[in-house]
C-alpha cells in the first residue's frame, strides 16, 4: 500500500524477541536486560497474525530480527507459516550467527531465503571484546555451513566505530573478492547504547568511500537503504548504510514490529502503535496497521538533531 506521501510500503521487519546471547557495546548494556513478563511480549501466534494482516495490505517482504531471533523457540515454525502466505515473496533474517550452524538447514527448508550476519570484527579477541564474550569461530562455521547449502549471497552487517574496528575495513571489503559474501558498512547511530560511543566513534560512509578510489558504483534500487559499490574482482557488492550522513527517507518502504508488539512506522520516531490491543480482531488489526502505515512520517531529523527520537533500544526494535 501507499503511505500519505506516496511511498510504497511493502517491507515489514519483525523483532521476535528483545533477548540476545551477546552484549554488543553499541546495542546492549553489559549486565544484559531485565527479562520481560510473558504478557509484555508478543507470542508466536500474535506475531503471525500481524504478518498475515500486513500481507493483505501489500507487504511482501519479511525480515525476522531480534535481539537474536534464533533464541525464539518457534522461529522455524514462524518462518514456515509465513512462507505459506502466497503474497510473501521474500523471507530474510538478521542474526549474530552464534546458533546458526546447527539450525540453518532446517530454516532453509522452512522457507528462509537469506541471512544477514552481524559481525563487527574478524579478529577473535576483538570480536569477543565488542560482543562481550562471543565466540567468532561459531560465526565462521555458520557462514561456511550457510554457503555450503546454497544460502547465497550472505550479507555481513558491520557497524564501523572509529578507534575500535575501523582498521579492519579493508579486510571486510576483501571478503567480497574471495567469497559470495556481501558486506554492509553501517554508520554508528546515537540510539540506545550507541549514544555513549557516538561522539568519539562515529565515522561517515563518505570518509570510507573517499579512501577507496577503486570502488565502482553499482545501480541501487530506490528503496534500498544502502549505496552499493564493488571492486572489479568482487563476487558480491559492498554497501554503505548511512542514516547519519545520508538518510534514505524519500524511498523508505518499511515499517517495524517490535518484540513488545508495537508497530513503528519509522525507526527513529517516537511514534508507535500497540498492536497487542487489536490482535483478537482481524478487522481491527488490519485497520490499525493500515492507519499506521498511511501516517508514516515523511522523514526523521536525526541528522540535524544528532539523536534518535526513539525511546526504544536497538535490541527491542531490531534495527
Curated annotation (Swiss-Prot):
PANTHER family (alphabetical): MOLYBDENUM COFACTOR BIOSYNTHESIS PROTEIN 1, MOLYBDOPTERIN COFACTOR SYNTHESIS PROTEIN A
The keyword Metal-binding appears for this protein: yes
Annotated ranges, domain Radical SAM core: 4-227
Binding annotation for GTP: 13, 63, 94, 155, 254-256
EC number: 4.1.99.22
Pathway involvement of the protein, from the record: Cofactor biosynthesis; molybdopterin biosynthesis
Name of the protein in its database record: GTP 3',8-cyclase
UniProt record, GO biological process: Mo-molybdopterin cofactor biosynthetic process
Positions contributing to [4Fe-4S] cluster 1 binding: 20, 24, 27
Name of the coding gene: moaA
Reactions it catalyzes: GTP + AH2 + S-adenosyl-L-methionine = (8S)-3',8-cyclo-7,8-dihydroguanosine 5'-triphosphate + 5'-deoxyadenosine + L-methionine + A + H(+)
Binding partners and assembly: Monomer and homodimer.
CDD domains per the UniProt record, alphabetical: Radical_SAM, Twitch_MoaA
Function according to Swiss-Prot or TrEMBL: Catalyzes the cyclization of GTP to (8S)-3',8-cyclo-7,8-dihydroguanosine 5'-triphosphate.
UniProt-annotated binding residues for S-adenosyl-L-methionine: 26, 67, 118, 189
Binding site for [4Fe-4S] cluster 2: 249, 252, 266
Amino acid at each position: 500500500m501507499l503511505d500519505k506521501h506516496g511511498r510504497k510500503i511493502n517491507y515489514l521487519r519483525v523483532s521476535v524477541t528483545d533477548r540476545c546471547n551477546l552484549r554488543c557495546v553499541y546495542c546492549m548494556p553489559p549486565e544484559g536486560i531485565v527479562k520481560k513478563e510473558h504478557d509484555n511480549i508478543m507470542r508466536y501466534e500474535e506475531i503471525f497474525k500481524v504478518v498475515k494482516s500486513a500481507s493483505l495490505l501489500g507487504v511482501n517482504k519479511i525480515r525476522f530480527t531480534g535481539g537474536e531471533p534464533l533464541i525464539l523457540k518457534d522461529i522455524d515454525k514462524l518462518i514456515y507459516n509465513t512462507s505459506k502466505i502466497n503474497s510473501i515473496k521474500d523471507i530474510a533474517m538478521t542474526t549474530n550467527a552464534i546458533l546458526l550452524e546447527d539450525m540453518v538447514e532446517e530454516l532453509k527448508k522452512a522457507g528462509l531465503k537469506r541471512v544477514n550476519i552481524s559481525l563487527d570484527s574478524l579478529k577473535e579477541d576483538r570480536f569477543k571484546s565488542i560482543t562481550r564474550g562471543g565466540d567468532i569461530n561459531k560465526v565462521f562455521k555458520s557462514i561456511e555451513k550457510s554457503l555450503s547449502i546454497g544460502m547465497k549471497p550472505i550479507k555481513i552487517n558491520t557497524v564501523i566505530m572509529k578507534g575500535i574496528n575501523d582498521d579492519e575495513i579493508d579486510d571486510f571489503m576483501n571478503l567480497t573478492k574471495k567469497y559470495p559474501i556481501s558486506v554492509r558498512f553501517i554508520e554508528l547511530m546515537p540510539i540506545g547504547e550507541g549514544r555513549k560511543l557516538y561522539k568519539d566513534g562515529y565515522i561517515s560512509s563518505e570518509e570510507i568511500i573517499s579512501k577507496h578510489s577503486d570502488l565502482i558504483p553499482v545501480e541501487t534500487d530506490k528503496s534500498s537503504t544502502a549505496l552499493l559499490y564493488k571492486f572489479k574482482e568482487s563476487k558480491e557488492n559492498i554497501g554503505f548504510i548511512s542514516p547519519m550522513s545520508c538518510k534514505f527517507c524519500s524511498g523508505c518502504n518499511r515499517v517495524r514490529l517490535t518484540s513488545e508488539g508495537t508497530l513503528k512506522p519509522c525507526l527513529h520516531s517516537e511514534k508507535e502503535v500497540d498492536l497487542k490491543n487489536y490482535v483478537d480482531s482481524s478487522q481491527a488489526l488490519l485497520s490499525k496497521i493500515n492507519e499506521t502505515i498511511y501516517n508514516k512520517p515523511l522523514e526523521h531529523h536525526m541528522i540535524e538533531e544528532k539523536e534518535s527520537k526513539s525511546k526504544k533500544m536497538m535490541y527491542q526494535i531490531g534495527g
